[in-house]
């Protein structure tokens, strides 16, 4: 299944079989809890349409996205669609009209949801957004129960779930455990007042690997995003045996001999110490190759790591071909993935950038062709 065009210099191949296996392993690790597949930011840059369709076929409990526009991109999928990010006022009607599960962040928002749903002749299906320590969006878990009980009395509000989020689940620390306790306290008040929520979730990918307390009752579901693709946060445990789903490949655009003393690329950051065989790779930072590869990283050609020479350009990257003198224009270049005995991972790039894999995935450029294969 193709996510984009079938032709392009830079190709992102996502293995459907590995994606399915990762999903099944995640499901098995948290059973009997259900799994919500988080596919925000165009499935972390990998192409939401095809990936969402595959995961729905595999039985995901829901697909979660960050905003209304992302939900509309999958509106026809036969599954529960959850928006995690707070709605802007002018997005409310479309979200409710399409039956999306939407986040409820404060009482004033509940009043708006109720009025819109009443006008539309339907219910607003709400997941309470509970701030237990992220200080981002939602009801303050320390002072919210009276407002939540007021929300429950609004005739066109249906409270179907409640979720929260960890700022540091990869540590599995006391702060994260305290967040779980806060959630449980609010849940207990709701249940004591006859409010039973079908969707109760706090665990993200980091929590699945580091916080078993977030992956059992009273919670009903977990949310997973980056683990689906076989990637993990740089910090924390990797409890699940997941495999990378993607490769990024391009081709050599030109092979040339560059004389000793010549400089390579913008800023003249590399000077050839001798006559050198140099390859011009048809991919650059516009395609997602980090600038941090400049004079530090390598790409794989014919199974051989080829050091990046000079600064990564927008459209091209120059590499040394001294270890692959038979390389020619058109040869495959592996940016992420395996070639021969060597491999380069998303985590390798994240380490070079001093960032996390999420940023690396989301930085893959729009002109790179995504293919679910």
Labelled PLM ranges:
Residues 2-20, 69, 87-89, 106-112, ...:
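Active-site anion/phosphate-binding pocket segments in diverse small-molecule metabolic enzymes
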Residues 27:
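N-terminal nucleotide-binding beta1-loop-alpha1 segment
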Residues 6, 10-14, 18-20, 31-201, ...:
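Active-site-proximal beta-alpha core segment in soluble small-molecule metabolic enzymes
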Residues 22-24:
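Alpha-helical scaffold segments that flank or form the walls of functional sites
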């Amino acid at each position: 299944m193709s996510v984009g065009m079938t032709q392009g210099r830079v190709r992102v191949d996502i293995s459907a079989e590995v994606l399915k296996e990762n999903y099944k392993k995640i499901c098995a690790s948290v059973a009997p809890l259900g799994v919500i597949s988080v596919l925000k930011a165009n499935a972390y840059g990998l192409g939401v349409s095809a990936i969402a369709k595959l995961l729905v076929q595999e039985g995901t409990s829901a697909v979660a996205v960050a905003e209304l526009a992302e939900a509309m991109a999958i509106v026809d999928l036969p599954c529960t669609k959850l928006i995690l990010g707070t709605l802007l006022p002018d997005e409310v009607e479309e979200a409710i009209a399409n039956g999306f599960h939407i986040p409820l962040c404060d009482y004033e928002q509940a009043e708006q949801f109720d009025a819109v749903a009443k006008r539309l002749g339907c219910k607003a299906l709400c997941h309470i957004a509970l701030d237990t320590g992220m200080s981002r969006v939602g009801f303050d878990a320390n002072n919210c129960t009276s407002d939540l009980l007021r929300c429950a009395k609004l005739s066109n509000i249906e409270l179907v779930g409640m979720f929260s989020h960890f700022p540091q689940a990869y540590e599995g620390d006391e702060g994260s455990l305290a967040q779980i306790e806060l959630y449980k306290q609010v849940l207990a008040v709701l249940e004591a007042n006859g409010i039973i929520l079908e969707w109760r979730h706090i665990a993200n990918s980091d929590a699945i690997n580091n916080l078993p307390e977030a992956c059992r009752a009273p919670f009903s579901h977990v949310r997973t995003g980056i683990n689906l693709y076989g990637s993990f946060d740089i910090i924390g445990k990797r409890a699940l045996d997941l495999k990378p789903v993607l490769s990024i490949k391009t081709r050599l655009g030109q092979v040339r001999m560059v004389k000793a003393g010549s400089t390579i690329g913008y800023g003249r950051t590399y000077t050839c110490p001798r006559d050198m065989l140099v390859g011009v790779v048809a991919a650059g930072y516009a395609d997602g190759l980090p600038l941090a590869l400049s004079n530090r990283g390598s790409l794989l050609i014919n199974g051989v790591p080829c050091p990046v020479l000079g600064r990564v350009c927008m459209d091209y990257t120059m590499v040394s071909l001294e270890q692959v003198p038979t390389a020619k224009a058109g040869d495959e270049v592996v940016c992420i993935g395996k070639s021969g005995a060597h491999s380069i991972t998303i985590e390798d790039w994240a380490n070079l950038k001093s960032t996390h894999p999420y940023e690396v995935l989301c930085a893959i450029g729009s002109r790179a062709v995504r293919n679910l294969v």
